[in-house]
């Protein structure tokens, strides 16, 4: 094995500049999926209630909680597991179900009220995580892993990933040309890249495709639906610092039974992810 292909076990050997570049790539890799969850959730409530919830899941809060949760995870893991904790797409089905509930107390309910009950179900799902963590502390991870082997966690991860195919196709269909540019750049750098460029294909795909989008936008090209390729109006009108709208979660058995059991699937996904990462570091 030559020097350029040697596995680096200690990231500090890369030096600060390369560590920062890899960190930026990791940020871009997680960014799209993390912010897509609140966007999709809001679209579910829009379809069901005819309005976007002004409270509940927001992009800013999602990013903040993902960052805070990741830092807390690294403290608990003593900086030994290079993982990022972002949004889980597994809960999308639950949010969609709650958004479309129109019986009982949910009849005629606004999007904000339904979002409050859905978030209450997520809180209970979080409590299930706490219970599982206590069980692991009491009986040990080895005993728990007997019931969650790779043959169980692997298919769960695959199913969750495959369920996102429709979202990926829908997003790419906004502008197939830019989607192809990003994909082609990532594949090219991953296969033929040299040195540092070979390990940052996602970052290069984002940068180059964004430059292409800027050029197309300046040349007055539009998306197939006639919308602008890049629109900075919402960025210009928003404040540099602001607080998100707060809402107290509400609890109902129906919403809890819809949302909380999803935690079982995400637990298996999480265990599978951690096992895969642990096998490579």
Briefly describe each language-model feature range:
Residues 66-87, 136:
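Juxtamembrane transmembrane-helix boundary signature
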Residues 100, 113-220:
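Membrane-embedded alpha-helical modules
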Residues 44, 99-108, 136-137, 273-281:
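Helix-loop-helix connectors at the membrane interface of multi-pass transporters/channels
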Residues 1-60, 202-281:
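Helix-loop-helix hairpins and the membrane-proximal interhelical loops
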Residues 50-60, 104-121:
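Membrane-interface alpha-helices at helix entry/exit sites of multi-pass transporters
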């Amino acid at each position: 094995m030559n020097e350029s292909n040697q596995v680096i076990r200690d990231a500090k050997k890369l030096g600060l500049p390369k560590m920062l570049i890899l960190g930026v790539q990791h940020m871009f890799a997680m960014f799209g999926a993390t912010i897509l969850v609140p966007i999709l959730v809001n679209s579910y409530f829009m379809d069901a209630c005819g309005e976007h919830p002004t409270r509940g899941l927001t992009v800013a809060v999602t990013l903040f909680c993902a960052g805070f949760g990741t830092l807390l995870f690294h403290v608990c893991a003593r900086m030994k597991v290079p993982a990022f904790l972002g949004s889980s797409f597994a809960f999308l089905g639950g949010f969609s179900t709650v958004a479309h509930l129109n019986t009982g107390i949910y009849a005629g309910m606004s999007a904000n009220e339904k979002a409050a009950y859905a978030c209450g179900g997520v809180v209970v799902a979080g409590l299930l995580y706490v219970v599982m963590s206590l069980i692991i502390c009491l009986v040990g991870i080895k005993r728990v892993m007997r019931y969650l082997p790779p043959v169980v966690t692997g298919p769960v991860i695959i199913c969750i990933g495959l369920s996102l195919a429709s979202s990926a196709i829908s997003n790419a269909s906004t502008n197939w040309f830019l989607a192809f540019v990003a994909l082609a750049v990532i594949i090219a750098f991953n296969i033929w890249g040299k040195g540092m460029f070979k390990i940052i294909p996602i970052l290069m795909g984002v940068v180059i495709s964004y430059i292409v989008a800027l050029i197309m936008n300046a040349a007055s090209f539009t998306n197939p639906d006639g919308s602008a390729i890049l629109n900075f109006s919402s960025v210009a009108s928003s404040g540099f610092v602001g607080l998100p709208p707060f809402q107290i979660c509400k609890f109902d058995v129906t919403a809890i039974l819809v949302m909380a059991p999803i935690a079982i699937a995400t637990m298996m996904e999480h265990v599978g992810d951690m096992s895969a990462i642990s096998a490579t570091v």
